[in-house]
Amino acid sequence: MEIRDEAEGEFIYAARNANAEGIKFNAETGAIVLKLPFPKESGLDGKEFNPTAMTVAPNGDIFLADGYASDHIFKFDKTGKYLKFFGERGNELKQFNTAHGMCLDTHYDPPRLLICDRSKGRLLHYSLDGEFIAEVITGLGMPTSAAVQGDYVSVPDLQGGVVILGKDNKIVTVLGHSPDPARGAAFNIPQDQWKEGIFSGTHGSYWDKEGNLYVQDWNVSGRIMKLVRVSANAAK
């Protein structure tokens, strides 16, 4: 999911895997202004199409990850015209095994796609033209998504907490990880057993302009937690 301020207002770009499409809708009214179903122009069979992530380039080009099916990344222009696809399912260096999350990494000029290869516990960089650049980090649990703010990247992990990476792509800290491994990737934890500040399986996150972090926990009852940023001095 991505939130963007555009000339016509504020819009949310989001993948809907159950509906087999990506959408763009007005953040205030909820009106859908663009739908991106499977692009038949790609020449692929499209028997399965279950997109999981969506992000937008500075020029408005749209990227849609088919993370629950082919693991292709589809590229469209800002009007929804199909342009190309890249990436594929597999276990080689340049392949994905559940391209579950994706965002624009603005630490670089030009920006890069930062893609979560969930089942292989790593993040990858691709260019906006679909060319493989590098592995960013390996050895994570099950990274589900990524969000960039300033020098930091938040990476929710389905096995527990939220990994925070610095500008050098190294781990700064892990937030809310449960010491009990039985509570990682645990969907059915009842609400009366929730622990404040501890996650059971983070699935999404987003920063606000003050650097506070909103984290969505993968839970049968639904759970969103706000983590308030503190200064380095206040943390001492």
Predicted feature residues:
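Beta-rich, blade/repeat-based domains predominating
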Residues: M1-E10, E41-D61, N91-R112, K120-G121, ...
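Residue position within the beta-strands of beta-propeller blades
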Residues: A14, L64-A65, I115, V155, ...
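Short loop/turn segments immediately following the C-termini of beta-strands
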Residues: N17, G67-A69, H107, R118, ...
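A generic tandem-repeat structural signature
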Residues: E2-F38
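Structural signal for beta-propeller blades
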Residues: A20-I23, D71-I73, G121-L123, G161-V163, ...
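Short loop/turn segments that connect beta-strands within beta-propeller blades
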Residues: N26-T29, D77-K81, S127-E131, G166-K170, ...
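Blade-level signature of beta-propeller repeat domains, shared across WD40, Kelch, NHL, RCC1
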Residues: I198-K236
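Surface-exposed loop and turn segments in beta-propeller and other repeat-based domains
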Residues: V33-F49, K81-N97, T173-G197
